[in-house]
């Protein structure tokens, strides 16, 4: 199975380097749940940014911006889909109207062709 983790720092209590360090610890601790891919979704300049790579967390180096204070992370153990195809790795981008969002899940989705958002 995979792991989902995150950080919310609305008051900007931590600077970008401190957030990076904390997320590194969280993601590396989550490697026991998946080493096939690591990904992050975060805010920057009022927009959603998704950064993901087909590597274990200890090989992924996240660089955050000072305004990035809401971050979601995911470590993946591939059970379906090629881990080298980054489209299969989390988080996934989504959009409803003008609202962008990131999605990560734990488990296998069946009948994806029937899913509607």
Over which residues does each language-model region extend?
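N-terminal glutamine amidotransferase
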Residues: 1-108, 112
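Conserved small/polar residues in nucleotide/adenosyl-binding loops
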Residues: 115-117
């Amino acid at each position: 199975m995979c792991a989902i983790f995150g950080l919310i720092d609305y008051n900007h209590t931590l600077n970008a380097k401190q957030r990076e360090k904390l997320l590194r610890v969280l993601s590396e601790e989550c490697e026991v749940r998946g080493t096939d891919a690591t990904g992050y979704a975060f805010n920057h300049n009022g927009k959603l940014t998704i950064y993901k790579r087909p590597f274990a967390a200890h090989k992924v180096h996240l660089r955050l911006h000072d305004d990035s204070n809401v971050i979601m992370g995911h470590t993946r153990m591939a059970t379906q889909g090629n881990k080298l195809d980054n489209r299969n790795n989390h988080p996934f981008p989504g959009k409803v109207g003008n609202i962008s969002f990131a999605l990560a899940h734990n488990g296998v989705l069946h009948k994806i062709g029937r899913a509607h958002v």
